[in-house]
Amino acid sequence: MATHFNISGELTQELLAAGSNVSVNKISLTNTQKVSKCKVDLYIEKKLTGKFYLLKGVELPIGATLVYDDINFSNAANEFGLYIKLTDGATFTMTGSIDVTGTNTNVPGTNTLYTSELSVGDEIVVSGETRTISSITGNTTAVVSAAWGSDLANDTSPDCNPTALVDVIIN
């Protein structure tokens, strides 16, 4: 039976704990980020033995799937756990402009392409303030997770720091 994970961000995450007794034959990794590639480290680790990399710094293009098969490691008690670490994509300048009016969580865009350029979890930088996208409702309407500090100047070149998004399937 396959196990599925949606992984985001740059923190190391445990996919399988040592002692899970999961038989691993194949691991599929898909970059689901809309606008940037990401790097993947996939490794097994055992206490007092160390880390053994299956993939190290492998770049996953947008929408690409990498299938790692012919894999065999022990996931029994006191054996190996399976871990993943992602590296986010490069910062880019968004299309259009953003004019924040007041201390609220709205992200009003003009000629922006939120639905194709942003994903929930991405950070945007508007007039020097950085916020995390919590929802996207259209090309010119989005919401951030924390209120803006003030009525900001119209930013004609807002930046996006995309968060790595990878789907993992373990068979």
Show which residues each predicted segment covers.
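Solvent-exposed, conformationally flexible loop/turn segments
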Residues: 7-11, 61-68, 101-107, 155
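Autoprocessing Asn-cyclization modules and mimics
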Residues: 90-162
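C-terminal interaction-tip segments
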Residues: 1-22, 26, 30-35, 39, ...
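Short, surface-exposed beta-strand/strand-loop-strand elements in extracellular ectodomains
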Residues: 34-53
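Intrinsically disordered, low-complexity Pro/Gly/Ser/Thr-rich segments with frequent PxxP/GP/PP motifs
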Residues: 47-86
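Surface-exposed loop/edge segments in extracytoplasmic proteins
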Residues: 2, 48-56, 92-94, 129-132
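Extracellular and analogous surface-interaction loops
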Residues: 14-21, 71-75, 114
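Surface-exposed loop/turn positions
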Residues: 20, 64-67, 75-82, 90, ...
